[in-house]
């Protein structure tokens, strides 16, 4: 029997007034679907899992999580982080996997579920581009440090003649030089305190003066790109292109190495780190909770930001990866594996890094480990190299391993983000060759990344990360969840999951998606915006023009949502604006599984549910709120 009309997505008209859908497949649509080329699938499910691990278990775990934790309560930060993981991270991650696999579409095309929300996809693409550009600059730094790690002596371990108040980072010499300089400084009565505080390690001065040639301010411009970092940036983009040039056929094979190799290095570093003197103190410092921080709303905000950053939620790569799955792939298992492994890796990375920093503090005779830690980029390229240079045995080997690990982690993250952009373009323009789009976007990524390898590049990185990445992703993730769960409807969405997985959706997911996840995200976002303060880099506030540029960047990303919604309503007019607006909130005729046969089965499945619920509604005669509770518990079938 051919289904001529689509019931209102199995929703009772009296109780699902917000969730109606009038999908009416016709012969023209079916013919169009048959003519479209089939989407490439992963060679096997393990490639998908490894790809998700490579993007979710990345720089966010080894580079960002440790200093975020110690800045927000140490071990106490793990409590809000784990709570946020279960109430926001896991639900959002699973939701994005589902929507990608169900539709076999990228970040923009999935919004046939609610066409006026297509701006969410474009806004996420904008944020993804911002993140890609500065991520690639971090890769350039890792390539540079990896290359110089093979010198007979690590170049950041000793001072240059023109570096004033510098202390060598060599093992024993560091402490000796520090004590000598401090003693000399203290002998100068009026200048003692000033000179002591000016002492800097050779690793810090090497990074600031030799590698990035940092400017103290950017009021007079950011300067020209450094030629060495430009070459390193170019090498990074060549590797990225080679990995993604054939789509999932090439990136899927590379995912095994990108996902597993970092663990080999991480465990090797952990094995070495825990044997160092002072390592236990560093680990205790990392895990020791500061309970008072649990009542600080900023800590909870940082937990959400870290969760999004680490899992790559809200940027599109999870949706993109899942869109290449078979329709019946078991993604629930994969979602649980990746989100759990991500948390464990963050803990592993934190313990490893703080064991090394504990040894650094021990060598420097410093009681407070906080005094030897720098946040942001400085953690990876100042604190870690400083600690590694003090290793007694072959520091070059551990340095090369560490920076190669960072490079692999960065490649895994950027490959996913870049593939998201390429997929969006190829989904929109079906005739485009994937490798040509990959090459064009890689060239654009390289050119945009040049701004970050200038003397003022770290200033720009801080600005773009704060305004173009963090907050844009945050607000669009709220709209993403609202569009799927509140507009399309929780029950409709759960019906689709049941059809795809042949299993009912548990109460945990229903409650999180409909209540806990969106409410927590909205409250934290509002608090963040109300309490936001001007950003600064290296204890220096940005000039007014910098803050203005940042807000413009945020506005451009966030404005994608209303602008594309307005465009859709204007180009799909009905009798009145109100009718056009309401129609834009309903799924289009393109919504649903992309495979024609699967789509036909889905329509029949939804039709049967609608008939059953109509009978139940007449016999039960439930009140509105009772029916809502009944649906929430998943007993409406």
From Swiss-Prot:
Polar residues bias (residue ranges): 1-17
GO molecular function: amino acid:sodium symporter activity; D-amino acid transmembrane transporter activity; L-amino acid transmembrane transporter activity; neutral L-amino acid transmembrane transporter activity
Membrane topology (UniProt): Multi-pass membrane protein
Keywords, ordered alphabetically: Amino-acid transport, Glycoprotein, Ion transport, Membrane, Sodium, Sodium transport, Symport, Transmembrane, Transmembrane helix, Transport
Protein location: Membrane
Record topological domains on the Cytoplasmic side: 1-47
Pfam family membership, one: SNF
TM spans (from-to): 48-68, 75-95, 128-148, 225-245, 254-274, 303-323, 337-357, 397-417, 443-463, 470-490, 515-535, 549-569
GO biological process terms on file: amino acid import across plasma membrane; D-amino acid transport; neutral amino acid transport; sodium ion transport
Amino acid composition bias (Basic and acidic residues), ranges on this chain: 26-39
GO terms under cellular component: plasma membrane
Domain of life, source organism: Eukaryota
Keyword Membrane: yes
Sugar-modified residues: 181, 195
UniProt entry tagged with the keyword Transport: yes
Signal peptide residue numbers: none
Chain spans, region Disordered: 1-39
Job of this protein: Unusual broad substrate spectrum amino acid:sodium cotransporter that promotes absorption of the D isomers of essential amino acids. Neutral amino acids are the preferred substrates, especially methionine and phenylalanine.
Family note: Belongs to the sodium:neurotransmitter symporter (SNF) (TC 2.A.22) family.
Name listed for the protein in its UniProt record: Sodium-dependent nutrient amino acid transporter 1
Organism field: Drosophila virilis (Fruit fly)
This protein's encoding gene: NAAT1
